[in-house]
């Protein structure tokens, strides 16, 4: 265990300073010491954390987890569950209108083959969760995660959103992002369509 400084709290997540970096760690990984958290109130003291990671380490975890899913089919409502006959049927029951519209026809070709199911925000939620970071399930939740940054200042790990909040991907540098794009397509790394992107949020800060 190593000592870290708690600087904030959001639900079951602590915002901490660790090795000159700031990030979020779930309370399950925090062991409170003297001058740390007392009776649920923050005192700004130090405590210890098991497995705390820096922002750069968190980004590597998130990026590598998402990169491993490149080629997985886009599935409306998918949030990282394995794409099986049962899971696809459950999605069809949850989203009957989308199923009737044909949203799941493409995905049916990939069931029971070891693929995970992702829509755009599902990929982001799942990827960040691999580093213990909660950003919410939908684009409408994720647009409130972290802090707003200018598009001219984006850095790897930032979330990029379309103007209507209908799509989200993660910037990975060199004008590229990783996304689960749309029905009939796949998780992929591609050039950022900057004319389509209107907002950015920095979760790793």
Locate the predicted segments by residue.
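Active-site beta-strand termini and strand-to-loop segments that position acidic
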Residues: 18, 162, 203
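A generic structural signal for residues embedded in beta-strands
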Residues: 6, 161-162, 179
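Residue "hotspots" at secondary-structure boundaries inside conserved domains
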Residues: 116, 152-153
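Structural motif
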Residues: 2, 157-158
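SH3/SH3-like beta-barrel superfamily modules
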Residues: 1-30
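Surface-exposed patches in mature extracellular/periplasmic domains of secreted proteins
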Residues: 12, 73-81, 135-141
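Aromatic- and glycine-rich peptidoglycan recognition patches
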Residues: 30-68, 133-152, 166-167, 172-205
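N-terminal capping segments
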Residues: 40-121, 126-131, 178-180
């Amino acid at each position: 265990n190593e000592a870290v400084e708690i600087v904030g709290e959001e639900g079951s997540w602590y915002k901490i300073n660790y090795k000159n970096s700031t990030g979020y760690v779930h309370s399950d990984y925090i062991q409170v010491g003297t001058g740390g958290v007392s009776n649920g109130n923050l005192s700004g003291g130090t405590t210890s954390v098991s497995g705390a990671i820096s922002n750069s380490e968190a980004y590597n975890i998130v990026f590598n987890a998402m990169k491993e899913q490149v080629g997985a089919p886009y599935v409306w409502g998918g949030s990282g569950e394995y794409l099986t006959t049962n899971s696809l049927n459950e999605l069809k029951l949850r989203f009957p209108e989308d199923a009737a519209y044909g949203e799941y026809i493409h995905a049916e070709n990939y069931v029971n083959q070891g693929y995970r199911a992702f829509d755009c925000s599902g990929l982001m939620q799942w990827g960040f969760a691999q580093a213990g970071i909660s950003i919410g399930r939908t684009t409408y939740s994720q647009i409130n995660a972290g802090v707003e940054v200018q598009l001219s200042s984006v850095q790897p790990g930032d979330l990029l959103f379309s103007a209507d909040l209908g799509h989200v991907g993660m910037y990975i540098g060199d004008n590229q992002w990783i996304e689960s794009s749309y029905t009939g397509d796949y998780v992929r790394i591609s050039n950022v369509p900057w004319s389509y992107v209107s907002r950015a949020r920095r979760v790793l800060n």
